[in-house]
Regions:
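Adenosine-phosphate binding glycine-rich loop
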Residues: 274-275, 280-321
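Phosphate/diphosphate ligand-binding glycine-rich loop within oxidoreductases
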Residues: 36, 40-145, 285
Length: 321
């Protein structure tokens, strides 16, 4: 009897133990690639990559990931499929599942990803929606784990427990209560993390996601409008653009609302002395983060970007039959 297919639309689609397993496997795959060892563990698998939103990191990392695992990617942009011409999502889902072993979608409405998953008989991965960005936060958590566990150069010795390491540090989010903030809230609720978020009034995270995360009874989630309060003594600082894709018309209003929320050196200095800085990219330097910080010693942004590849390989290995 075939096992029921799994989707990855939200961090809550996995358990804390499964998430830790994915992070550990992502680290193994990182070292395997550094050693230039072949790791074609999913030969012949076909992955559909559907993009209603433009992409750099998501497209390249998923395409490289499936190819290095021995599979192939079929890439569909907004003008390449009937989705952009009004075909029902459920029809696209059923057809793509007949051709491919998995579907990754990067779109605006989270309901699109949910409907694809509902009707596709193969795993569906959320490459980004306006509500959530679980693949990015999976890579972010891998980055935090590797940095804290001092495993950036060698896997020698027994690797520290993933969940213990992740729970040993305190996290801060500064900026828009967007899909990244929402997903960090999910991470806190799932893994039991200590998370503070600083967002301006009227730009808070999704209330339902916040309630669900708090409802787990795990971790600590604190909301404030004071960036300095949020970062004080924290070990991990994260931010994102103030005007996400699709919000460009609000850019000027958002710049005014987010005055004082820029992750600059003064704000970083209020965090723990060994704090690390994350940014999912692309960055608008001088707006949500300064050039000095993103290029500075606290930044782990480039390893974070690379880890999208390794984390998504681990995810594809786990999800694809």
């Amino acid at each position: 009897m075939m096992e029921k297919k799994r989707d990855f639309l939200s961090l809550f689609d996995v358990s804390d133990v499964e998430l830790a397993m994915l992070i550990r496997r992502a680290e193994e795959l990182r070292f395997v690639r550094q050693m230039r060892e072949p790791h074609a563990t999913r030969p012949g698998r076909m992955l559909a990559l559907i993009f209603e939103k433009a992409s750099t990191r998501t497209r390249v990392s998923f395409e490289v990931a499936i190819q290095e695992l021995g599979g192939h990617a079929v890439i569909l942009g907004r003008n390449d499929s009937q989705l952009g011409r009004g075909e029902p999502i459920k029809d696209t889902a059923r057809v793509m599942a007949r051709y491919c072993h998995g579907i990754m979608v990067r779109t605006f409405g989270h309901d699109v990803a949910e409907e694809l998953a509902r009707y596709a008989s193969v795993p569906v991965i959320n490459g980004l929606t306006d509500l959530l960005h679980p693949c990015q936060v999976l890579a972010d958590l891998q980055t935090v784990y590797a940095h804290v566990a001092n495993r950036e150069t060698s896997p020698s010795g027994q690797a520290p427990d993933v969940l213990s390491v992740l729970r040993s540090v305190r996290y801060a989010w500064v900026g828009d209560g967007n899909n990244m903030a929402n997903t960090w809230i999910e991470a806190a609720g799932l893994l039991g993390l200590d998370l503070a978020l600083a967002c301006p009034k009227n730009y808070e995270p999704d209330a339902k996601i916040l309630a669900k995360a708090k409802g787990t009874g795990k971790g600590k989630i604190h909301l404030t409008q004071d960036p300095r309060e949020a970062v004080s003594g924290r070990h991990v600082l994260s931010t994102d653009v103030f005007a996400s894709m699709g919000k460009e018309t609000e850019a000027e209003a958002r710049r005014q609302a987010f005055a004082g929320y820029c992750l600059d050196q003064k704000l970083v200095s209020a965090a723990d002395g060994k704090a690390m800085v994350l940014h999912c990219l692309p960055a608008h330097r001088g707006e949500e983060i300064t050039d000095e910080v993103i290029e500075g010693p606290a930044s782990v942004v480039w390893q974070e970007a690379e880890n999208r590849l390794h984390a998504q390989k681990a995810l594809l290995e786990w999800l694809l039959p």
